[in-house]
């Protein structure tokens, strides 16, 4: 991630450090919908400190007397943080919140809904991050530039595993490599999905880095697949003179490739750019068919509108901002700090 492009590269970073104490790293999940108040599934909004989402699910399922496999969550939240999120359980009774409290875990709200929570049932995540020793004035200048220019929607380093090994295994799997690691990933659905998604993310980051290097980050190219940032709808750019200003106004964004055998195709110049990237990698779109349902492909917005609110602390500053699901706070903090921005984020995709 240290060699990933920056949209505020000419501005000095704030410096400072992001400590890993839970209180310095707060994440509030913004759900895709709120529970209706009625239904067979118990919904609990919880706050946790120093515990993973899976640990919280296990603890609460045991206390409620339901199988852990039947519990639901919308996204994984990291252990080294203070986080809030909704969890669901097929429980008949409504418990007292105090009765479910345990070390590092408390229940904030109790409700009900018709369906189980599932991964992806989240709209966004709201972050509050303390930067110790950071220069507030420098952070403010970078935040202002970021709000105007847009955030490159890059994947954070946690997506790729230790030293990028997950992505390497994903590429090997798609190419039919007979190595032991690739064969093991092919047999294990979780490892297969993890490895292939890491490789897809690596290719997306390279595609976006090339767009930025060529001055095409905040505009449209003929044949681009564009994404409406309010609804998520996709369409193909027929006239960059028409759609380019819409990109600049954050109405739409170029939608980069998460390559797969069912990927919506770009056209013209945009397609040629994607084909050159695959050729440089020595892989073809048809190779992704080896990944089956884990490698169908999709489109991801390349540029996001992000406004960072900054407040002074005695020894630094507090950064508050919201990102859509699947986007990484690490990317925002690199723009502000320029160094020392590694974050203990859980990978939710």
UniProtKB/Swiss-Prot annotation:
Keywords: Isomerase, tRNA processing. HAMAP family: TruD. It is an enzyme of class 5 (isomerase). It catalyses: uridine(13) in tRNA = pseudouridine(13) in tRNA. Its EC number is 5.4.99.27. Coiled coil: none annotated. Responsible for synthesis of pseudouridine from uracil-13 in transfer RNAs. Residues 1-22 are annotated as: Disordered. The keyword Ribonucleoprotein does not apply. The active site is at 78 (nucleophile). One of its GO terms (biological process) is tRNA pseudouridine synthesis. This is tRNA pseudouridine synthase D. It comes from the Bacteria.
């Amino acid at each position: 991630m240290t060699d990933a492009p920056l949209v505020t590269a000419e501005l000095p970073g704030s410096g400072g450090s992001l400590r890993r104490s839970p209180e310095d790293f707060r994440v509030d999940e913004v759900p895709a919908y709120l529970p209706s108040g009625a239904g067979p599934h118990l919904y609990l909004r919880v706050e946790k400190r120093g515990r993973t989402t899976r640990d919280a699910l296990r603890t609460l399922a045991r206390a409620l007397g339901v199988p852990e496999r039947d519990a639901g969550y919308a996204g994984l939240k990291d252990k080294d943080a203070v986080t809030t999120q909704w969890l669901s359980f097929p429980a008949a009774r409504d418990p007292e919140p105090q009765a479910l409290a345990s070390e590092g875990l408390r229940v904030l709200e109790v409700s009900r809904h018709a369906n189980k929570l599932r991964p992806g049932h989240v709209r966004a995540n709201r972050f509050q991050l303390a930067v110790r020793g950071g220069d507030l004035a420098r952070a403010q200048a970078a935040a202002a530039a970021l709000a105007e220019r847009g955030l490159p929607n890059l994947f954070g380093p946690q997506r790729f595993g230790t030293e990028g090994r997950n992505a390497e295994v994903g590429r090997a799997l798609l190419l039919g490599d007979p190595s032991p690691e690739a064969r093991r990933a092919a047999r294990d659905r979780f490892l297969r999905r993890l490895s292939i998604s890491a490789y897809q993310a690596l290719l997306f980051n390279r595609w976006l880095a090339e767009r930025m290097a060529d001055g095409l980050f905040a505009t449209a190219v003929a044949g681009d697949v564009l994404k409406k940032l309010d609804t998520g709808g996709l369409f193909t750019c027929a006239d960059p003179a028409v759609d380019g200003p819409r990109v600049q106004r954050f109405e739409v964004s170029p939608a980069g490739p998460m390559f797969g055998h069912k990927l919506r195709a770009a056209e013209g110049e945009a397609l040629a750019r994607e084909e050159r990237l695959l050729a440089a990698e020595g892989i073809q779109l048809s190779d992704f068919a080896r990944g089956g349902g884990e490698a169908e492909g999709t489109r991801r917005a390349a540029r996001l509108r992000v406004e960072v609110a900054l407040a002074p602390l005695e020894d630094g500053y507090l950064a508050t901002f919201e990102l859509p699901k699947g986007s990484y706070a690490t990317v925002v903090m690199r723009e502000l700090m320029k160094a020392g921005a590694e974050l203990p984020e859980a990978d939710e995709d």
